[in-house]
Design a protein with these regions (language model features):
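Conserved nucleotide- and phosphate/pyrophosphate-binding catalytic cores
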Residues: 1-80
Length: 80
């Protein structure tokens, strides 16, 4: 699925937990933290191991950011 988010969120940088929460990939911030601790979240095919990681416009690859949750759930986050 493709999810649209506002460019202003990434312009100044946003915490990875808030980024995933704004994209509505998981239901709660605690669920996101748990998935990060279990190494279940990838951004652009790189495992996220730090829940304080900042996501910004530098993560854009072909105008989108690929977020994976688990083995089979993959999302493209595009800038609106």
């Amino acid at each position: 699925p493709i999810i649209l988010i506002k460019e202003s969120l990434l312009k100044n940088g946003i915490n990875v937990i808030d980024f995933i929460n704004n994209a509505k990939i998981l239901n709660s911030k605690s669920e996101i933290r748990r998935a990060i601790n279990e190494k279940g979240i990838k951004i652009n095919d790189i495992i996220v191991s730090d829940h304080k990681k900042i996501i910004n416009l530098g993560f854009l690859d072909n105008d989108c950011i690929k977020v994976s949750y688990g083995k089979k759930k993959h999302y493209k986050i595009k800038i609106n």
